[in-house]
């Protein structure tokens, strides 16, 4: 991916176990308790509660619609299921893998340094 495209990204989502940048990143997209939405231009963020995390099935596509509604341009997560992946890609959201077991802040730093693998 070209650096020009990365510079255009303004809002990214990082899956999280908590509501702050110092929370542990969550590897599961649909089951993540929180989505941290970061504006890479201003550095501001908001924490969204994933109301679908405890659902019995089909949580990934529902969570994807929540992220899409927030006009995110990239998602940083460990694993994204097939149906959620299709919905996110159809919406033009780039997917990046983060499986380091660190914090949301670490995932964000790696994203900003182009150190994450783009998986789709």
Q: Could you tell me what each predicted segment is?
A:
Residues 76-77, 97:
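Conserved SAM-binding loop
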Residues 73:
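Short acidic/polar active-site loop segments enriched in Thr and Asp
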Residues 1-58, 62, 69-70, 89-120:
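Non-catalytic interface/targeting segments
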Residues 80-86:
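Short, glycine/polar-rich helix-capping loops at beta-to-alpha or helix-loop-helix junctions
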């Amino acid at each position: 991916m070209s650096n020009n495209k990365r510079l255009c990204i303004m809002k990214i989502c990082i899956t999280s176990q908590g509501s702050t940048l110092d929370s542990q990143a969550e590897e599961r997209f649909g089951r993540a308790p929180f989505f941290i939405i970061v504006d890479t231009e201003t550095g501001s963020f908001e924490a969204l509660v994933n109301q679908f995390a405890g659902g019995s099935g089909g949580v990934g596509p529902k969570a994807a619609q929540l992220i899409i509604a927030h006009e995110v341009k990239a998602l940083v997560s460990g694993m994204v299921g097939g149906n959620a992946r299709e919905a996110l890609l159809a919406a033009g959201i780039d997917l990046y893998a983060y499986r380091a077991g660190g914090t949301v802040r670490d995932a964000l730093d790696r994203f900003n340094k182009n150190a994450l693998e783009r998986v789709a």
